[in-house]
């Protein structure tokens, strides 16, 4: 039993990151952000973190007198444990009361994620057609808010032209979009015989910022940790949102000193080798794969499951982020949730209490490293805000994991000067004011600019 625990701890210690190392990470990330901001002024300059400026509408609770569209469609191309697109109709009234109707449309087969962009968009548009038929909206031409969890560059104000710069999170379409994402999706919708009005493309972190700002006027940072990770913050002068796209941090070798052999194995097998290094060390999609690799090695060393391995343990991405959050949140003496994941997901027969404890230990080591690295990044952003702020947090890591937000907040406070005060606050999607901000963006798009 001692040998089993020792073997697991030897693996777990590989994921430890000291405070001194986190300070180095923060300094290097700050330098990378400076380079990204400089790149906006000097397009030829090199930068791993893009730090794109995005002009957004006033990030404060909108007034009833603001021009808005009373009804619009929302389309969220998401991953999050199930490959799907989420369609929603949103109806507003003057009192910010919201009525919604939602459906999810599967993105199977998974070859859609690695084929041609046109095929992916045609599949999404066919789901939109089914949704429109169900609610008799095929010919209505409602405005559309299109949310993407990928790096998106806005040429000007939110609601203007937007370009998809890179596929991430397991997507790896063979071709790239030649121009405006909104225009390309309108073409796909037309092929599906669905009429849509003005289309605005939103980044997931910017959407989180809007949700937070609708509730708290001091919201100046949005942090998302899901199958990917990103952060945006309001610029010093309050006129733009800086979309960091910090998942790419480390592509220049800045994180090489922290990479374990499991990180390197995962990177080589991924859809985008040598890209999105920070994201691969912190996001739910990749954390679970690191857990699987580590557990497979420990079991192969006869230190878990009596040395038995299963086909599920050898299957890439067999463990989903939701399983990791379930395991981490299990505090029962019987390890009931851990045991369920081991038996139903990894096909382990009759796992012992020690197996459950060691599995949870490995999960905790990898999750803690993620939280610490995210905290290092957050500390960099907080130093740039300069006064007390609310940080709105979103994504499955914060929503589902019982302690992830606490770990991030605690470590960020250690790494940030004491005079920098901040509050972490989860997104409240039950309010109508956030939808009103999106509706205000859609209303700002000229009707004649239907291709946007």
Predicted regions and their residues:
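Glycine-rich phosphate-binding loop and adjoining helix at the ATP-binding site
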Residues: 103-125, 129, 152-214, 221, ...
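ATP-binding/phosphotransfer module of carbohydrate and carboxylate kinases, centering on a glycine-rich
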Residues: 1-142, 214-215, 264-452
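Short beta-strand scaffold segments in enzyme catalytic cores
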Residues: 83-91, 207-211, 222-223, 229-235
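Short beta-strand segments
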Residues: 76, 145-149, 202, 222-228, ...
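Alpha-helical segment proximal to the catalytic Tyr-Lys
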Residues: 219-220, 232, 238-277, 281
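Short, glycine-/Ser/Thr-/acidic-enriched flexible segments
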Residues: 228-229, 249, 292, 398
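Short, internal active-site loops enriched in acidic
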Residues: 148-154, 205-208, 396-399, 429-431
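Short, glycine/charge-rich beta-strand/loop segments that flank catalytic centers
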Residues: 48-51, 142-150, 200-207
